[in-house]
Amino acid sequence: HTTPYAGLIYDINDNWSAYASYTSIFQPQNKRDKAGQYLAPITGNNYEAGLKSDWMNSRLTTTLSVFRIEQNNVAQATTIPIPGSNGEFAWKSTDGTVSKGVEFEVNGAITDNWQMTFGATRYVAEDNEGNAVNPNLPRTSVKLFTRYRLPAIPELTVGGGVNWQNRVYKDTTTPYGTFRAEQGSYALVDLFTRYQVTKNFSVQGNINNLFDKTYDTNIDGSIVYGAPRNVSLTANYQF
């Protein structure tokens, strides 16, 4: 299947440029309906436009974009079991889904030794009747990452990041009423330190989920908790 793409970039001046793009969507799915048949591929259109800036020879770059995604055959979870599937629940297709939102990202070298990245996304997704589509996916997310190389010990780099998302939920209708599973907003903090032993060899230590946040990653079904606080040590050699 061929998916057309078209894009246009206009340089406003030495620092600013504007762009617009269009992409056709064709995405096969691995979800099955109540008859056990795989859902038809997602089809639709993706429109995006925005502004980009570049300052001080790319030491600071920014991107601001708006987007609109029109889709048919979008999978949504149901509570109907698929016969003979050992407990697998069926999915249904939803047509006329429209997602629209805005994204912002800034990347900068604050100093020669200190880099930082910040990004945020906000969008809404509704079907042709105005109902929320897949509210189990976060509508707002924010990320911040930074790293710093110590001037006194240039082989040593430390850094970390924060990823935040808003609350998500899933409504399930049963003969006894409608029940809502919900995961509140949460932030995950990660840290790392890397030491460049030689030009080709480095070691790195990571602490993931620093504050040991408990969160559910699967409110569609049974509770699946995200990884608790964990520590890892890796070695890397580049030939």
Question: Model-predicted segments: where are they?
Answer:
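Residue-level signature of outer-membrane beta-barrel architecture
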Residues: L8-I12, P41, L51-W55, G108-A109, ...
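Outer-membrane beta-barrel channels and translocator barrels
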Residues: N13, G44, M56-S58, S99, ...
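Gram-negative outer-membrane beta-barrel transporters
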Residues: W91-T173, F211-T214, T234-N236
